[in-house]
């Protein structure tokens, strides 16, 4: 795809200088790197020289210079106007770069501040235009995001609270079944509302979602709720750690992780740590997913705070694979570097050390908020997403440490979207038996999953409910098996309830690409 250059001189590849798994990351250099990768790897119109990009942006009415773009592409400056112009000039999905950057910058409160002036809706007519597709129920991702950003601005023409709550619930229903840029744009819309005066409405809508006894996909909703901190919501999430439904324990753990990262204040855990320990102690050692997620929450607590209550912890937390421990991490780091070398070459670029760092965080970072943010950056661009899928699924299939394979298998699903490596696709399509996670890769990629394989999974797997599990595969795929479950005798109330939830919620959602036509 060409050589990255500015005025004829090769640009030095960017890297994050902060310690691996340390307390902070360099957000600025990451978002600058994403913009550089967008310019160099755009599938239709890459710009291999900064001077070429300056010319394109001038065609769009944005006057700039190579030195200004260099500062933006190295993370020294953050400017949403330039990000929007990159999307247009490079023919990328509208809002894809802006949404991913906004999400990452919200997650880490020490992120660079956007110097672009906030666009304010200037008239009731403009606000009505933004309301229209949302109220009609046919908004695509970018329309959801524009609506949410306008709603979040004080003084705009909003909606009655009940109507707003209904629309937020609809957004949540779309979020949990969307993938790729369709997902990240909707997530940004929901998180934007959560961080606004409408945050309480988002919390109420989330409570209603979780009140359904058969809810199947709570994690993304809980993650978005966790983007804003208040004592009551923190307490509510801690209470959910004791919920009898394992799915909600997982969702609460993820929400608390995001809240702790985004809040970034010392003493976040102190007011609730005794209750966290009590929930942990109520679960027997080796008690499956519940024990694993409660162990995950304990690991989120700073070491000095956890040390103060360690004597109250009834038994050791779930083990971490050797390759995920500090002492054994070097081999996984090197594996990610090798994949980054191969991926960089596939993109026509010199070795990108920041790509290796992001790959490691997807598969090796214990904090789900960190891995989620890294996956969003890798998933924002078609070329990056493909090489990241190649790398993560290779680790999932071949790494010697089973704990690494399990984590890569699970987290790889967030990157798959519309692409599977050809060898992986062929193997899965020809297999008579698949794990739930493997079947999920096919379903998320929009590939047909054989009904006989799905039924075999349904009758033999112990992973039926929740993200990446058998019923989510059947639901995302829109398989006729869903309706058959509701008609056939012999299925448990829990299985029937989950199938009915998917029928109500809908199947895989991906926004139409700009310029696509029907037929």
Where do the protein language model's features map onto the residues?
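Extended amphipathic alpha-helical coiled-coil/heptad-repeat regions
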Residues: 164-517
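A short, Lys/Arg-rich alpha-helix, primarily the initiator
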Residues: 1-49
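Short C-terminal boundary/hinge segments that cap the last helix of small helical domains
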Residues: 25, 91-107
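Recognition helix of helix-turn-helix/homeodomain-like DNA-binding domains
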Residues: 56-78, 101-105
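Key DNA-contact positions within bacterial/archaeal DNA-binding proteins
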Residues: 51, 67, 95
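Short alpha-helical "recognition helix" segments of helix-turn-helix
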Residues: 47-58
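DNA major-groove recognition helix of helix-turn-helix/homeodomain DNA-binding modules
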Residues: 76-97
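Helix-turn-helix/homeodomain-like alpha-helical modules used for DNA recognition
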Residues: 106-177
């Amino acid at each position: 795809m060409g050589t990255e250059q500015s005025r004829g001189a090769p640009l030095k590849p960017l890297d994050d200088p902060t310690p691996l798994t340390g307390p902070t990351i360099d957000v600025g250099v990451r978002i600058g790197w994403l913009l550089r990768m967008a310019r160099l790897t755009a599938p239709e119109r890459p710009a291999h020289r900064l001077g070429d990009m300056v010319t394109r942006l001038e065609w769009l009415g944005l006057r700039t210079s190579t030195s200004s773009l260099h500062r933006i592409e190295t993370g020294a400056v953050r400017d949403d106007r330039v990000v929007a112009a990159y999307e247009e000039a490079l023919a990328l999905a509208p809002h894809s770069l802006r949404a991913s950057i906004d999400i990452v910058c919200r997650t880490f409160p020490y992120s660079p501040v956007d110097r672009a002036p906030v666009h304010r809706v200037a008239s009731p007519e403009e606000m009505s235009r933004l309301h229209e597709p949302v109220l009609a129920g046919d908004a695509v991702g970018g329309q959801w995001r524009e609506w949410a950003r306008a709603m979040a601005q004080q003084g705009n023409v909003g909606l009655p609270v009940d109507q707003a709550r209904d629309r937020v619930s609809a957004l949540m229903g779309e979020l949990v079944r969307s993938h790729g840029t369709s997902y990240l744009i909707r997530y940004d819309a929901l998180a934007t509302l959560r961080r606004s005066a409408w945050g309480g409405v988002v919390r109420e809508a989330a409570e209603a979602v979780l009140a359904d006894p058969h809810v199947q996909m709570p994690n993304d909703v809980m993650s978005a709720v966790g983007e804003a901190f208040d004592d009551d919501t923190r307490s509510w999430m801690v209470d959910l750690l004791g919920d009898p439904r394992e799915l909600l324990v997982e969702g609460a753990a993820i929400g608390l992780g995001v809240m702790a990262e985004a809040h970034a204040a010392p003493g976040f855990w102190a007011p609730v740590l005794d209750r966290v320990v009590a929930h942990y102690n109520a679960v027997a050692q080796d008690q499956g997913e519940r024990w694993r997620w409660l162990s995950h929450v304990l690991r989120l607590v700073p070491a000095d705070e956890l040390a103060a209550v360690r004597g109250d912890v009834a038994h050791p937390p779930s083990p971490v694979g050797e390759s995920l421990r500090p002492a054994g991490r070097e081999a996984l780091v090197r594996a990610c570097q090798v994949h980054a070398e191969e991926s960089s070459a596939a993109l026509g670029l010199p070795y990108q050390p920041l790509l290796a760092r992001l790959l490691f965080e997807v598969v090796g970072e214990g904090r789900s908020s960190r891995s989620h943010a890294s996956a969003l950056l890798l998933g924002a661009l078609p070329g990056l997403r493909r090489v990241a899928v190649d790398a993560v699924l290779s680790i999932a299939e071949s790494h010697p440490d089973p704990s690494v394979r399990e984590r890569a298998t699970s987290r790889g699903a967030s990157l798959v979207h519309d692409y599977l490596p050809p060898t992986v696709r062929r193997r899965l399509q020809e297999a008579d038996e698949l794990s739930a996670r493997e079947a999920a890769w096919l379903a998320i990629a929009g590939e047909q999953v054989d009904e006989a394989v799905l039924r075999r999974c349904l009758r033999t797997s112990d992973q039926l409910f929740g993200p990446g599990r058998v019923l989510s595969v059947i639901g995302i795929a829109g398989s006729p098996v869903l309706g058959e479950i509701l008609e056939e005798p012999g299925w448990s109330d829990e299985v029937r309830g989950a199938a009915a939830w998917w029928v109500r919620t809908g199947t895989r959602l991906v926004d139409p690409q700009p310029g696509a036509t029907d037929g």
